[in-house]
């Protein structure tokens, strides 16, 4: 699916943007703090209904405005569709071809074909940072693979909050009543993540070998569930094992007022040659591993959807060494995908630019075309 046109109104620092992107590569140039990342976030928000960065929805609205809006025309096998989302302090409202979700349009229809993958400098810290970032990666990748994950995750968060509140203040029977919905929703997420990791692992291994060469150690990817829950079983058995872990930890959880087992406590393990990459990988190896993980995600979606996702790359080239940057740009040039890239330095992108690459300057929230 290709983005034909983009309209942004009062989103972050973008007052009014009308953009006709290239069907292949659109490059946004400008100094830091001018709005390049905000434009990528507008596209990401449109295609996922979630902010790219962890903020309150009110922070997406330009200062002084009551609401922000993003709309885009997407061309796919079924023709052209217009998707739009308005955001304000009170929430967001999405529409598909002018029909609001829930009253004429379904969430599944809205997300059909709207897969987008973002790659930012923060992702390069995925290996050495804490598990929160790796869980966010898993959740975003799972959402792209199965959009129903959005509703499943919301169900889990509701159940988790209810059980945590009961652990802190409620009688035993109240906690027990919230445990079953938590187990049901948690097992569904565990199985989704397990299946996703199984799909990504061989692609990660192949991409890392291609980036790093035949002498590099073998890359591995695994899912580690908290509380010793073994996820390599059918969903009903995973649910039973999660329930057992929660029962075994009940007294500890009561003391802390917090649920200590479940998807919100799990981790994604990345290893090189059988050793944890976080502790034993060099910075260069860690960055190559993250690059390989992103390529694995893209290729997995390409296989599942029959086409590559929309790509959003936020100043990644400036954070990679020349060899890895050449690999990334070469990969993008060969991939039949629509990509949006930001950079403060045109020279980092230009070697891979094709005749259909469109360059724009972003300055103080204003987006202007540049001569290619």
Curated annotation (Swiss-Prot):
HAMAP family recorded for this chain?
RecF
Name of protein: DNA replication and repair protein RecF
Report the Gene3D superfamilies cross-referenced here.
P-loop containing nucleotide triphosphate hydrolases, RecF/RecN/SMC, N-terminal domain
Q: Which GO terms describe its cellular component?
A: cytoplasm
Q: Name one GO biological process term.
A: DNA replication
Q: Which cysteines are joined by disulfide bonds?
A: none
GO MF, any single term: ATP binding
Q: Name the gene for this chain.
A: recF
Database matches in SUPFAM superfamilies: P-loop containing nucleoside triphosphate hydrolases
Q: Which PANTHER family match?
A: DNA REPLICATION AND REPAIR PROTEIN RECF
Annotated InterPro entries: DNA-binding_RecF, DNA-binding_RecF_CS, P-loop_NTPase, RecF/RecN/SMC_N, RecF_2
* Pfam families reported in the protein's UniProt record: SMC_N (PF02463)
Q: Which NCBIfam families match?
A: recf
Record bears the keyword ATP-binding: yes
Summarize the protein's role: The RecF protein is involved in DNA metabolism; it is required for DNA replication and normal SOS inducibility. RecF binds preferentially to single-stranded, linear DNA. It also seems to bind ATP.
Q: Does the keyword Ligase apply?
A: no
Q: Which residues bind ATP?
A: 30-37
Which family is annotated? Belongs to the RecF family.
This protein's UniProt keywords: ATP-binding, Cytoplasm, DNA damage, DNA repair, DNA replication, DNA-binding, Nucleotide-binding, SOS response
Subcellular location as annotated:
Cytoplasm
């Amino acid at each position: 699916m290709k983005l034909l046109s983009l309209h942004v109104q009062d989103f972050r620092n973008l007052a009014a943007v009308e953009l006709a992107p290239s069907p292949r590569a659109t490059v946004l140039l400008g100094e830091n703090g001018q709005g390049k990342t905000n434009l990528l976030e507008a596209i990401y928000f449109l295609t996922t209904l979630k902010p790219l960065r962890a903020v309150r929805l009110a922070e997406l609205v330009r200062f002084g405005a009551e609401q922000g809006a993003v709309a885009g025309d997407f061309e796919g096998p079924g023709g052209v569709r217009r998707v739009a989302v308005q955001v304000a302090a009170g929430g967001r409202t999405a529409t598909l071809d002018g029909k609001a979700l829930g009253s004429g349009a379904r969430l599944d229809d809205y997300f059909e074909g709207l897969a987008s993958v973002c790659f930012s400098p923060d992702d390069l810290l995925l290996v050495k940072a804490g598990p929160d970032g790796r869980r966010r990666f898993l959740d975003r990748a799972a959402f792209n693979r199965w959009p129903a994950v959005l509703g499943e995750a919301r169900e889990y968060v509701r159940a988790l909050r209810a059980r945590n509140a009961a652990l802190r203040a409620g009688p035993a029977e109240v906690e027990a009543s919230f445990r079953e919905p938590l187990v049901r929703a948690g097992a569904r997420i565990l199985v989704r993540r397990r299946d996703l990791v199984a799909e990504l692992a061989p692609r990660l291994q192949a991409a890392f070998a291609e980036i790093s060469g035949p002498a590099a150690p073998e890359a591995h990817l695994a899912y580690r569930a908290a509380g010793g829950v073994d996820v390599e079983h059918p969903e009903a058995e995973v649910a039973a094992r999660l329930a057992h872990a929660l029962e075994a930890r009940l007294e500890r959880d009561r003391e802390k007022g917090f649920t200590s087992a479940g998807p919100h406590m799990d981790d994604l393990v990345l290893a090189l040659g059988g050793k944890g990459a976080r502790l034993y990988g060099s910075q260069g190896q860690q960055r190559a591993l993250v690059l390989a993980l992103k390529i694995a995600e893209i290729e997995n979606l390409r296989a599942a959807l029959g086409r590559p996702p929309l790509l959003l790359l936020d100043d990644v080239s400036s954070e990679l060494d020349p060899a890895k940057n050449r690999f990334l740009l070469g990969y993008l040039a060969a991939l039949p995908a629509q990509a949006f890239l930001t950079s403060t330095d045109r020279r980092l992108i230009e070697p891979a630019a094709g005749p259909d690459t469109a360059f724009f300057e972003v300055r103080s929230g204003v987006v202007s075309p540049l001569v290619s």
